[in-house]
């Protein structure tokens, strides 16, 4: 078992959702925190909540898609705390898309730059410090869509499958080199976060046309799928970290889908299409939104 008390933990995407819940859960367990997010307002709110518990906390506005910025941040955290034990690469975006054939390259680039490259940037920047701690742990947040593909989610699924592959490779390399760094990949199912609504808001800011069907589909997806409270998701993740698990499934939906994918690899795509079509029928079924 791993003890989190007195560990220095870095959490990206800490402004809301799972990231905020992780920050508060880590604070409850006695960690010292370095929190980052591109959303300065939400990040400040999280910092206030954490500080109210008496926890030592440092925060920074951070765009994880910017490699130089992330490398600078890693140095700042190490200089401030003197050591870094845990890294939670949680920052991510949904990125509303259509079919792969119809999705613009800019959508692929935007989603991959945050969801995949953000994880690579964070891991590469902090890994030397984690090794130096003698008791390091990398925790990368993938998704249910890191082992189950969904039509209409090409960029998102690509990014989350990539996080899974990268993390599993890193785990093997740390074991091969006998490095003091544990590596965990997390697959959340439907967590009640703001990721779907945020994707709509970001699309509006970019001037994209938002149809009523798309708005209704997002609302229905939130209602049908995004049910697990982020606080519960964070507790599952932190319990898994404490138990040194290399793979953490968050929610019954993630566990069931994982089982279906492994037992029915040839049939799960058809099952996925049928289930989503039935559940999302009232709002249209051209595309769906990510699970977590």
State what each model feature region is.
Residues 2-33:
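Canonical Rossmann dinucleotide-binding motif of NAD(H)/NADP(H)-dependent dehydrogenases/reductases
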Residues 40-41, 61-72, 105:
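The beta1-alpha1 cofactor-binding region of Rossmann-like NAD(H)/NADP(H)-dependent oxidoreductases
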Residues 53-56, 76-89, 96:
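A glycine-rich helix->loop->beta "capping" turn
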Residues 98-100, 104-109:
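Substrate-binding pocket helix/loop in short-chain dehydrogenase/reductase
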Residues 123, 159:
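Active-site helix of classical SDR
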Residues 143:
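Residue(s) in the substrate-gating loop at a strand-loop-helix junction
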Residues 176-252:
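SDR active-site lid
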């Amino acid at each position: 078992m791993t003890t989190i008390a007195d560990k220095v933990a870095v959490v990206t995407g800490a402004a809301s959702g799972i990231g905020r819940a992780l920050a508060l859960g880590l604070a409850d367990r006695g960690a010292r925190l370095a929190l980052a997010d591109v959303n300065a307002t939400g990040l400040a709110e999280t910092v206030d909540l954490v500080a109210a518990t008496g926890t030592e906390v440092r925060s920074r506005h951070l765009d994880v898609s910017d490699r130089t910025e992330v490398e600078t941040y890693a140095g700042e955290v190490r200089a401030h705390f003197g050591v870094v034990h845990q890294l939670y690469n949680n920052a991510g975006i949904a990125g509303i898309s259509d079919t792969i054939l119809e999705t613009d390259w800019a959508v692929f680039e935007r989603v991959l730059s945050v969801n995949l490259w953000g994880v690579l940037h964070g891991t590469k920047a902090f890994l030397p410090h984690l090794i130096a701690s003698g008791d390091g742990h990398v925790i990368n947040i993938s998704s249910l869509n890191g082992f189950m593909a969904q039509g209409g989610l090409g960029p998102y699924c690509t990014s989350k499958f990539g996080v899974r592959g990268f993390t599993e490779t890193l785990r093997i390399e740390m074991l091969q080199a006998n490095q003091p760094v544990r590596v965990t990949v997390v697959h959340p199912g439907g967590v009640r976060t703001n990721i779907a609504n945020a994707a709509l808001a970001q699309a509006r800011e970019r001037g994209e046309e938002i149809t009523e069907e798309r708005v209704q589909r997002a609302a229905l997806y939130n209602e049908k799928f995004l049910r697990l409270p982020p606080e519960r998701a964070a507790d599952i993740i932190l319990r898994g970290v404490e138990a040194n698990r290399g793979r953490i499934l968050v929610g019954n939906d993630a566990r069931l889908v994982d089982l279906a994918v492994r037992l029915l690899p040839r049939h799960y795509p058809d099952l996925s299409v049928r289930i989503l079509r039935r559940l999302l029928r009232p709002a249209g079924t051209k595309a769906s939104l990510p699970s977590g």
